[in-house]
A protein has these predicted regions:
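ABC family nucleotide-binding domain
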Residues: 15-223, 227-230
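ABC-family P-loop ATPase nucleotide-binding domain
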Residues: 1-26, 236-241
C-alpha cells in the first residue's frame, strides 16, 4: 500500500471543538443494564483527526452517536462547537446537526432518484439556499473529489468508491466544523478506501476541520493526529499509536 502523508505536520488549534465530560450511555436498568459508554472524557481541538479503534460492540459507534447528537447521554456533558447538546431542544438539536456536523457512514444512503449533484444539494436546500447557489456549490465539491464527470449520474451508476465520495461531499455541503465518520472505508476495496482516507486527511490539513473516525482500519493511523482504543465503553490511548 502507498504510504499516506504523515500527520505530524498538522498544527491543531488550541480551542476545543468537541468536549466530553464524564459521559455515560446506559441501556436497561438494574442487573441487566449495559454501559455502552462509561465515563468518557475527551477534548478535541480544531484541526485534529482522532481515530477510535475497537472491536464491534466496544461502544465506539455509540460514542460517535453521542458526539453527533444522534443519541442523548444518560449522564455527563457533550459539547460541540461551544454548544451543550443536552441543553438543546429536539428541534434545535436537529438544526444544529444539519449545520454543524457532517456524517459519513459505512452504509450511507444516497437517494436513487436523484443525481450525484442533487444528492449533495439536498442539505443546502434544506438550509434555505437558493437552487442555483446550491447547484454551483454541489458541483464545486464533486469536482474537488474527482467526480466532475459524474454530476448527472444516479447512485446506481456509480462505483462504491464514487458513492462514498458523493456521501462525503454531501457531509461537507454546509461547511460543518465537525466531521463524524463511522467505518468510512468498511465497504470499499483497498484503492477506494485509500482515496477516502486521503480525503479525510485533506479536510484536516487544508481546512482545520475536526474529524472523528471510528474504524477497524489501521491504515487510518497513518493520517490520524491521535489514536484511541475503545473497549467496554472506555477510551484509552492505543498501544500501537
Amino acid at each position: 500500500m502507498n504510504e499516506f502523508p504523515q500527520a505530524s505536520s498538522l498544527q491543531p488549534r488550541a480551542r476545543n471543538v468537541v468536549s466530553l465530560c464524564e459521559v455515560r450511555k446506559v441501556y436497561g436498568v438494574g442487573e441487566t443494564a449495559v454501559r455502552a459508554v462509561d465515563g468518557v472524557n475527551l477534548s478535541v481541538p480544531a484541526g485534529e483527526l482522532v481515530l477510535i479503534l475497537g472491536p464491534s460492540g466496544s461502544g465506539k459507534t455509540t460514542l460517535l452517536s453521542l458526539i453527533g447528537g444522534l443519541l442523548r447521554p444518560t449522564s455527563g456533558v457533550v459539547q460541540v462547537a461551544g454548544n451543550d447538546l443536552g441543553q438543546l431542544s429536539s428541534a434545535a438539536l436537529a438544526n444544529f446537526r444539519l449545520r454543524q456536523i457532517g456524517f459519513v457512514f459505512q452504509f450511507f444512503q444516497l437517494f436513487s432518484s436523484l443525481t450525484a449533484s442533487e444528492n449533495v444539494e439536498m442539505p443546502l436546500r434544506l438550509a434555505g439556499c437558493a437552487a442555483r447557489e446550491a447547484q454551483q456549490h454541489a458541483e464545486f465539491l464533486l469536482e474537488r473529489f474527482g467526480l466532475s464527470q459524474r454530476l448527472l449520474y444516479r447512485p446506481q451508476n456509480l462505483s462504491g468508491g464514487e458513492k462514498q465520495r458523493v456521501a462525503l461531499a454531501r457531509a461537507l455541503a454546509l461547511h460543518p466544523p465537525v466531521i463524524i465518520a463511522d467505518e468510512p472505508t468498511g465497504s470499499l476495496d483497498s484503492r477506494n478506501g485509500e482515496e477516502v482516507i486521503r480525503l479525510l486527511r485533506q479536510l484536516v490539513d487544508d481546512e482545520q476541520r475536526t474529524v472523528l473516525v471510528a474504524s477497524h482500519d489501521r491504515r487510518i493511523t497513518q493520517v490520524a493526529t491521535r489514536v484511541l482504543r475503545c473497549e467496554d465503553g472506555r477510551l484509552t490511548p492505543d498501544s500501537c499509536e
